[in-house]
Curated annotation (Swiss-Prot):
Keywords on record: Cell cycle, Cell division, Cytoplasm, Meiosis, Septation
Species name: Schizosaccharomyces pombe (strain 972 / ATCC 24843) (Fission yeast)
Gene Ontology annotations for the cellular component aspect, listed alphabetically: cell division site; cytosol
Protein name as annotated: Meiotically up-regulated gene 8 protein
Alphabetical list of InterPro entries matching this protein: Msb1/Mug8, Msb1/Mug8_dom
Main location per the UniProt record: cytoplasm
Amino acid sequence: MSRSICTLTCILPTFSMDYWNQECVELSQVENLFTELASRLELLEMNSKNVLYRLTIGTNPDRNWEAIAFIREFFDSAKHGYVIPKHEIRNRIRLLSEASLISCLRWLLHRIPGGVITWSTYKLFDEAETRANYPVRGFDIFMKHATKHSCHFNILKCFLKLLMSLSAKLAVSSNSSTVSSLELVSQIASIWAFDWPMMNLQETFIYWDRCTNACLRLLLCYIRYTNKSSETGFSCLPSALQSQLQSFNYPPSLKKLNDAKAHVFTFSMNYYMTRDPLEMIQIVTKMNIPDHLTATLPRSSDDIQNDCLFALRQVSKRSSYHSVFSAQESAWTDFIKNGFDHPILPTCTQETVYSLLTGNDTACVYPFPNKPYRLPDVDFEIFSHCSFESLTTVTTNTNIWWVWAESRCTEIPESKRTVFPNCTMLIDKTGRLIILQQTVPQKPVALTASSNKRKNRIFGKIRRSFKRILKPRKINKTVKIMSNSQRRSCQSVLSEGNRTILLHLADQMNACSLQTKSRESIKTLKLIEEKDEYWEPETAGYFNTIVGWADQRKSLYDEAVIKINHSNMLNTLPPTSQGATSTTVSSASSNFLSSSCTPIDDTNSVTGSTLSCSFDEMKLSDKIDDANSLKDDDFIQGSKKDFFEMNLNHSSYQNKDELKPFQLLVKHAFKPPSYRLIRPPLRDWQSSDTLSSEMSKSISSSRSSPFSLEQTISKIQNKL
């Protein structure tokens, strides 16, 4: 009895670093990038009234894909010590939109160790300049010695030059009616210039005052150093800055910014820490508070300034945004209602799925609102655990609201979100600053029956979605070869959707099913025996491949590489030893990475970026060797197999009448999926991974999201 062996090997790749989520950067590596970004931003003509809003608030976080792709591409190109030429960086930056340009610059500002200036550098400069009696060229002389490296000095110069340019644009803005634009820019830039430790509110206001005075002094010192007169004796500075400089002496006197009163409303909840500013406002407006304090706090959204409320909506989108849901386009119709559909405020469903994906089972028990463009209707359960604590008055400045908004930007790494961690700032119609602060919960409380029931419903909905996707319709016992439409029914849904989320979520669901508290909610996804006559063998192998692959997942953003040994290599394969560990699986399941499957002429090769493959016609018996198949208990315990092997018996196919519907390998070839059907994976997205160079060049500047290629390409074709 002769046997042929077809080996399907799943090779997990080496995990590359996600450059966007790194905590800090090396100055020598980003010097040229920072210089070109700052220079480009200076040249942009921005409306002076929107400068502060664009710098601190930004755009919707689901449009950050351009900045994320740019940062990842830059660091990936600069690895192994390669220095990207300045002209190449400049050409790449010119293609960025204004929002992406600001996002990339803000990303760098928040990842420079110790801030752009750092306190050690400022103290050395202050001491040297004071002893020298403040010479005009003091910045160029003393700052070079205060900074440790020339790259730090160059970045600091570009930073101050950018602040000077923004001050000139803000000089005619209505936002700077109470203070000069130089002071206003220094107040906002304080969060970029220095490192901010964890402090309480009053200490934060004092620290902000200190940072602002240091920024203002360095900015005036730089302007004083660069203020060179022309041949006719006139200053080269903008006229708006010249008029402001007349009101400043050097060195400037220390100013107390905290000269206004603000109300701090403090409340507590026993088990829930809110992260959304709109949700916090809704909690306060619905909370029972003493009658004599109702006039002090806003009781509805009408009591908040329109501009402030609009900005809070943007901050709310950023606060509730998880990187896990960045795809936001799923091919699974009604997978989870609003689960991946442009999340604006966190929902209980999103938090449950997010907790599964991250392995944290504590975040999914809290009720969350789901009203996108207005103040959310918070679950009534949440108010039963809210309690009013105090209403106090602090001395601060209204402009610190811009610093608070900047502290909520998506570009700040999670480990550095130490500024205003538990509060929301808003401005009412009278122009008063109101601070809503929540105390840290002390201990969790037991879940109510309704919360458990809600969680079980979500788990059941997730599982039903898995069953609908992974178990296509069964076939009859009559002889029938797998058609293209049936193959697509069990492949295209996963390949066109967020397949990585599905794989990882399946793994997390199996892990949760082992827990006592989740056994009634989640049933383990078990392996299917391929000899079951009610299952298509191809579908069974496809299902088992997904379940086995989900058990081997190490990262959400890495794709496994599938290596296929073709039929012309079968004779050269070594025989399988009885002691080797292997798993029976259908080789046709290897095609599930294709978005479309269309029969074409035969081919015997797999090219680098395409997903085409060919198989010689082989016949398979109705009894498939399942001696090496995985047991359910082994999979639940996390057993991992390296190779998938399948023994095919040709001798049992002497008679064609014996052919059963369990034929796994047929003579098919699949052409690469068309551009219209491709959806990029969830991992680090790059246009070159999915599109051809010509296609990438034609649509790179026009699409609004890498996950809406189908709409973008159709629009381009309609225009042509």
